[in-house]
A protein has these predicted regions:
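Active-site nucleophile loop of the alpha/beta-hydrolase fold
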Residues: 18, 114-121
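C-terminal catalytic histidine-bearing segment of alpha/beta-hydrolase fold enzymes
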Residues: 157-194
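Short beta-strand/loop motif that positions the catalytic acidic residue
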Residues: 129, 134-141
Length: 194
């Protein structure tokens, strides 16, 4: 929530999920972006925090096309241009967690919150060494791989990155269970930058 007369304390870019391969046009009414609305709304309630939810061109990653990266990078650039003095935190679910890892090669990114990230081919290696990283992953996730996320966080820590893995016991991919844990942990992470 922006407070007139006070500077922005943090900028947050929310990155929704998608799927492996799809050229279906992206819609805000698809389940993946709708799943992130509660996070976006909760984050917007934080004082002096600007929140933008990214909109991709198509619904899929699409192999080497890396389809969501260009629109997500453009959204990140706009957010930074509008608020150059505030730390930027990326919040990504599933494919959005993969997008966040790639965008976090940019040293202007202060933090990455990866929610059940779909990390492939060591995507976490893109994250620069000064970023703080928190990854939450449900232990019952059948779509993405909690063990891979935990491995990625361990490798980031070996590089000296401030990174933490939090397993959500019994949690599934859609984050429809343990809602309070997903939400409160996310809010606490973003608040830590204020």
């Amino acid at each position: 929530m922006l407070i007139p007369g006070l500077p922005v304390a943090a900028s947050v870019l929310v990155l929704p999920g998608g799927t492996d391969n799809s050229t279906t046009p992206f819609s805000r009414r698809q389940p993946a972006p709708m799943r992130m609305y509660p996070f976006t709304l909760s984050l917007r309630a934080l004082p002096r925090v600007v929140v933008h939810q990214a909109v991709y061109d198509v619904h899929g990653w699409n192999g080497e096309h890396n389809s969501p990266l260009a629109p997500a990078q453009a959204a990140l650039d706009r957010l930074i241009d509008a608020h150059p003095d505030s730390p930027v935190i990326l919040v990504g679910h599933s494919m959005g967690g993969r997008v966040a890892a790639h965008l976090a090669a940019d040293k202007r990114v202060a933090g990455v919150l990866a929610l059940a990230p779909w990390w492939q081919h060591a995507d976490w290696e893109y994250i620069h060494g000064e970023a703080r990283v928190l990854a939450l992953h449900g232990t019952a996730d059948q779509r993405t791989y909690p063990a891979r996320t935990e491995k990625g966080i361990a490798q980031l820590r070996e590089r000296g990155v401030d990174a933490e893995f939090v397993p959500i016991e019994g949690g599934g991919h859609a984050m429809l269970d343990h809602v309070w844990t997903w939400q409160s942990t996310s809010l606490t992470f973003v608040r830590s930058f204020l």
